[in-house]
UniProtKB/Swiss-Prot annotation:
Cofactor dependence: Mg(2+)
Source organism superkingdom: Bacteria
Cellular component, GO annotation: cytoplasm
The protein's role, per its UniProt record: Catalyzes the dephosphorylation of 2-6 carbon acid sugars in vitro.
Class in the EC hierarchy, top level: hydrolase
PANTHER family: 4-NITROPHENYLPHOSPHATASE-RELATED, HALOACID DEHALOGENASE-LIKE HYDROLASE DOMAIN-CONTAINING PROTEIN 2
Protein source organism: Staphylococcus aureus (strain MRSA252)
EC number annotated for this UniProt entry: 3.1.3.-
Family under the similarity heading: Belongs to the HAD-like hydrolase superfamily. NagD family.
Gene: nagD
Keyword annotations from UniProtKB, A to Z: Hydrolase, Magnesium, Metal-binding
Name recorded for this polypeptide: Acid sugar phosphatase
CDD domains: HAD_Pase_UmpH-like
One Gene Ontology molecular-function label: phosphatase activity
InterPro entries, per the entry: HAD-like_sf (IPR036412), HAD-SF_hydro_IIA (IPR006357), HAD-SF_hydro_IIA_hyp1 (IPR006354), HAD_sf (IPR023214)
Length: 259
């Protein structure tokens, strides 16, 4: 197995499933830290701030720092502020998205007369929120969605994801959003900029082919699939472009790296 200078690592299905740590996750991060290999946690979860993500990882005894976390909310805020500094935004989403947009100098409004409509996972979504978002897009606001995941793994099973919520506005308006998170290149390019490395020097680690693995493939990066979440070994082997590597878990990845 190739030795990479850095790793981009998914969270849900790779580091943990819901509130349960996945076997090998802590060991993999400990291995990278001992070797002095930088890594970033890249997640489509827009509801949490980097500090909240870090706290969850630390509760599982997985080493993490806020500056090592790249959320779809952060990538979304950066994308908008680079295009339109100080723009007005109507958003659906949690505290992670609200904080990211505000700290990027964007103005959050509660009506449809805005420059951007941004959809992130909102566990308190209502018809009125969707109505305002729909009117905003119809009024000409640029339509952004943090990530396309139509379902998310939870302890109860697979629940509606942000892609499902986004589809309500998209179907109603006939407008397709610009997605920011995996598998889109935008969040991956942002992560590479933070690392200061070329895509050939970095590998993407994740469980879900359609988001994690495709995000690496879409930017020309090597990919490491772990069979600890959604996509099985059979799933990824049957794809037109399979991952560079597929392991039972991250313990198996460590064993390969140590050869």
């Amino acid at each position: 197995m190739k030795q990479y200078k850095a790793y981009l690592i998914d969270l849900d299905g790779t580091m943990y499933m819901g509130t349960d740590e996945i076997d090998g996750a802590k060991q993999f991060i400990d291995y990278l830290n001992v070797k002095g290999i930088p890594h970033l946690y890249v997640t489509n979860n827009s509801t949490k701030t980097p500090e909240q993500v870090t706290e969850k990882l630390r509760e599982m005894h997985i080493d993490a720092k806020p500056e090592e976390v790249v959320t779809s909310a952060l990538a979304t805020a950066d994308y908008i502020s680079e295009q339109s500094p100080g723009a007005s935004v109507y958003m659906l989403g949690g505290s992670g998205l609200n904080t990211a947009l505000t700290e990027a100098g964007l103005v959050i409004k509660n009506d449809e007369h805005v420059d951007y409509v941004v959809i992130g996972l909102d566990e308190q979504v209502t018809y009125e929120k969707l109505a305002i978002a729909t009117l905003g897009v119809r009024n000409g606001a640029t339509f952004i969605s943090t990530n396309p995941d139509v379902s998310i793994p939870k302890e109860r099973g697979f629940l509606p994801g942000n892609g499902a919520i986004t589809s309500v506005v998209s179907v109603s308006t006939g407008v397709s959003p610009q997605f920011i998170g995996k598998p889109e290149p935008i969040i991956m390019v942002k992560a590479l900029e933070i690392l200061g490395l070329d895509k050939s020097e970095v590998a993407m680690v994740g469980d879900l082919y359609d988001t994690d693995i495709m995000s690496g493939i879409n930017v020309g990066m090597d990919t490491i699939h772990v069979q600890t979440g959604v996509s099985t070994l059979e799933d990824v082997q049957n794809k037109n472009v399979p991952p560079t590597y597929s392991f039972k878990d991250l313990n198996e990845a460590i064993a390969e790296l140590e050869k």
